[in-house]
Amino acid sequence: MVKTHNLGFPRIGAQRELKFGLERYWNGDATRDELTALGAALRRRHWSDQRDLDLAPLGDFAFYDHVLDMSFTLGNLPKRVQDFHGDALDNYFRVARGRSAHSAHEHASCCGGVAAGEMTKWFDTNYHYIVPEFHADTNFSLDPSRLLQQLAEANAQRVNAKPVILGPVTYLWLGKAKDDSDRLALLPKLLPVYGALLDTLTAQGVEWVQIDEPILVTELDADWRRALRTAYEALETRRIKLLLATYFGQLQDNLELAVSLPVDGLHIDAVNARDEVDALARALPPTRVLSVGAIDGRNIWRTDLNAALDWLEPLARQLGERLWLAPSCSLLHVPVDLASEQKLDAEIRSWLAFALQKLAELKLLATALNQGRDTVADALAENAAAIESRRRSPRVHNPAVKSAVARIDARLGNRASAYPQRAAAQSARLKLPLFPTTTIGSFPQTAEIRDARRRFKAGELDEAGYRHAMHAEIERSVREQESLQLDVLVHGEAERNDMVEYFGEQLDGYAFSQFGWVQSYGSRCVKPPILFGDISRPSAMTVEWIAYAQSLTSKPMKGMLTGPVTILNWSFVRDDQPRSVSCYQLALAIRDEVLDLERAGVRVIQIDEAALREGLPLRRAQWPAYLKWAIDAFRIAANGVRDDTQIHTHMCYSEFNDIIASIAEMDADVITIETSRSDMELLDAFDGFRYPNEIGPGVYDIHSPNIPTQEHIVGLMRKAAERIPAQRLWVNPDCGLKTRRWAEVLPALTNMVAAAKTLRSELRNGL
């Protein structure tokens, strides 16, 4: 009999209950007991949702981040929080956010307290994890309380649970040695703690543990391969069964290694590695389980179940009970339940599957394999009809858009002049000081803004009333910026619910959910739009708002756009054509908007490419092809303007030392980047590469509520000036300020502007 299991379930709740519970707790409006009770209630519900599985995951729930959870399980707390009094939950949030709940007096390290842990992308997804921190003298100690508590809950609910833990080698690989020591040198100290954890779970009657080593789908050198072998040979002696889980890609040159590791089962991402399944089935020892990730855990399209059965049936005959079925990866990356989407177009809705629907697909596949297709014939017929509807729909295919993409040539991506000529023209037009100050785009989304948007969508506020409310918020943002004496202003994006969804709502070829939320980090959730068809722009999307904002000030007002690569990477993207084609379609639409902004008199236009790096394939051998079309798409979008129009781009969470040449090829006049959490480490890229244009290294971490001091910002910019000529440096935050409160934003920006003035004075005086 084929078994079913799941690698992980969305933790935020179908209605974002975890998000709101966390924020109530952080704001002092909920107690610790109320927060922990909410977590327990969500786990109970999620296990109930997975009751038809043979094995449900346990330990996939986290209050902030599962990698941070693993750090606490292993006793690996950053040194800066070890001396704080209070319990583990206090320290947990200190590492995640820079402060515990209810502790407004705690500030970042720049201000005498604790800095939030560095945050970066989880492989090539839009989820972010807190980076484990290591030193040569790091020690580990087991704290199994989180897993044991959840195991007790699962047992009380009579759930057949499979604990999920991050594997030791991936854990080290994901982390950062703060003293540049060798992370792998810690493996001998780490493995006994993993062994003790497995022994603890064995003593509790656990049969299977899922141990995730997704680095097996990346390019590994000999040391990391040797570490994997060492780790699993050391853990082999434990009396518990290990399911080694890989996901997000193909094993390729690691396939032989994965097969040879002494574990009891191996999970493979069969969505991306379908052509490796047969080889694995032949190569695995005759007692080993092969778990096949046959359902896409990262996208929301329905599975073609009949096509899946065509290749699963021979596999089931070959492997019998050694075949397990699962999603390709954790369902953390998809929304919870399509049944909530009552306002979504019925035809498009019929093409989709969220987490609960994917589990139903899993059950249907297992039933067909175990009992025959005839037992689920009606469900298979309905699935086939939906697949065919999508394939043939004229809503998906637009001949005019396809023709426009076919006409793209290299000239479309080129500026009229090289950067030095453009810089001179822009300097004459903009007349900015040294160390010009700006922000990245958004200002706080206040309760008043959210209420106006809610009432407008509910029909309680007419369009004129909504525009009046948004104009008032835009004017407030402009006046605050003028008072702060910022040099290049933004309109604050009051009218935007999300930097991708806002544009998708105005593009043909997109659809939108009401409850399609997924976790980005902590309490931050995003609702990716659904790119289902060919993309076109029926009319201008931002010009009216930016033109109004510019009318309020004589200072330059930035037009704010999201770039084609980021819109693509932060959407649920159609899987029936290459991603590059969809990206070129988006680029043409954004290009039209850029030119409309320029015609409206906008002198500075920012095209955010926050997600450029996250689209990189996990294997470097595949990077050149991706970077070619991604950079081409940005250039198509940006480069139709005059020399004296200044193009900015922004990247957040982007470690791009290894793609700096490609970043330069974008040829943006100004690039702003996230650097503060890494203490300007990202600027190491400029030690060996002379970046030709202007750059704004982020000088404070907007993801933390802590207020940076003027002195701290000056210090960071001095570091930046060691690598970038001061004449080409901008001063700006790391990211947009949407998630912060005005009470946090105003003092932070006050200090930032004061720091810029200090830097100008130092430069004039030759300091």
From Swiss-Prot:
Binding site residues for 5-methyltetrahydropteroyltri-L-glutamate: R16, E17, L18, K19, K121, R524, C525, W570, E614
Cofactor annotation: Zn(2+)
Pfam family, one: Meth_synt_1
SUPFAM superfamilies for the chain: UROD/MetE-like
Binding site for L-methionine: I440, G441, S442, E493, D608
Class in the EC hierarchy, top level: transferase
Keyword Hydrolase part of the UniProt annotation: no
Reactions catalysed: 5-methyltetrahydropteroyltri-L-glutamate + L-homocysteine = tetrahydropteroyltri-L-glutamate + L-methionine
EC number(s) on file: 2.1.1.14
UniProt-annotated binding residues for Zn(2+): H650, C652, E674, C735
One Gene Ontology term of the molecular function aspect: 5-methyltetrahydropteroyltriglutamate-homocysteine S-methyltransferase activity
Active site per database record: H703 (proton donor)
Domain of life: Bacteria
Gene3D superfamilies documented for this protein: 3.20.20.210
Note on how the cofactor is bound: Binds 1 zinc ion per subunit.
Metabolic or biological pathway: Amino-acid biosynthesis; L-methionine biosynthesis via de novo pathway; L-methionine from L-homocysteine (MetE route): step 1/1
Record keywords: Amino-acid biosynthesis, Metal-binding, Methionine biosynthesis, Methyltransferase, Repeat, Transferase, Zinc
Binding-site positions, L-homocysteine: I440, G441, S442, E493, D608
Any GO BP annotation: methionine biosynthetic process
Protein family: Belongs to the vitamin-B12 independent methionine synthase family.
Task of the protein: Catalyzes the transfer of a methyl group from 5-methyltetrahydrofolate to homocysteine resulting in methionine formation.
UniProt xrefs under PANTHER family: 5-METHYLTETRAHYDROPTEROYLTRIGLUTAMATE--HOMOCYSTEINE METHYLTRANSFERASE (PTHR30519)
Designated name of the protein: 5-methyltetrahydropteroyltriglutamate--homocysteine methyltransferase
Originating organism: Burkholderia vietnamiensis (strain G4 / LMG 22486)
